[in-house]
Amino acid sequence: MSLISGIASILAIGLLSPVQSILALILLFVTVAINLYTSGYVLMGILYILVYVGAIAILFLFILSLLNIEYKPTGGMHPLVIVLILIPLIPLDIAFEPIAIVESVSTTYNELSIVGTLFYSEYAPMLVIIGIILIVSVIGAIAMTR
């Protein structure tokens, strides 16, 4: 997954079309999340998907549709070339073994339950305040569009 993440990051910067660049960025976020998940950081992998893929990429596509950028192709890499470059690298990525130190560490707690316990006990007032702010902002956005 690290190899695919590196290639996806290069493609996100190097592709000419903004839409293709966003798709490469989404691929990068998903592969990093899978890498975090398989390394034992389950919560961080899930949060990576929720925050980056769910919010930032969709927001960027929404902004691109509002700006109405005209795309004039000036050459570049054909998608078939990209696929032909990536296919031979897949066996290298599958054969990659995670670091033994990460596998030897065993956790006796569930990090999701710890975060949930902290949110709903110690940080409960802040959670309520954030909920009220979100509701007021949604109502304000609806009121502004009328």
Curated annotation (Swiss-Prot):
The keyword Transmembrane applies. One of its GO terms (cellular component) is mitochondrial membrane. The chain crosses the membrane at residues 10-30, 43-63, 81-101, 124-144. It is found in: Mitochondrion membrane. The keyword Mitochondrion applies. It catalyses: a ubiquinone + NADH + 5 H(+)(in) = a ubiquinol + NAD(+) + 4 H(+)(out). One of its GO terms (molecular function) is NADH dehydrogenase (ubiquinone) activity. It comes from the Eukaryota. Its main location: mitochondrion. GO terms for biological process: mitochondrial electron transport, NADH to ubiquinone. Keywords: Electron transport, Membrane, Mitochondrion, NAD, Respiratory chain, Translocase, Transmembrane, Transmembrane helix, Transport, Ubiquinone. Its EC number is 7.1.1.2. It is a multi-pass membrane protein. Belongs to the complex I subunit 6 family. Core subunit of the mitochondrial membrane respiratory chain NADH dehydrogenase (Complex I) that is believed to belong to the minimal assembly required for catalysis. Complex I functions in the transfer of electrons from NADH to the respiratory chain. The immediate electron acceptor for the enzyme is believed to be ubiquinone. This is NADH-ubiquinone oxidoreductase chain 6. The gene is NAD6.
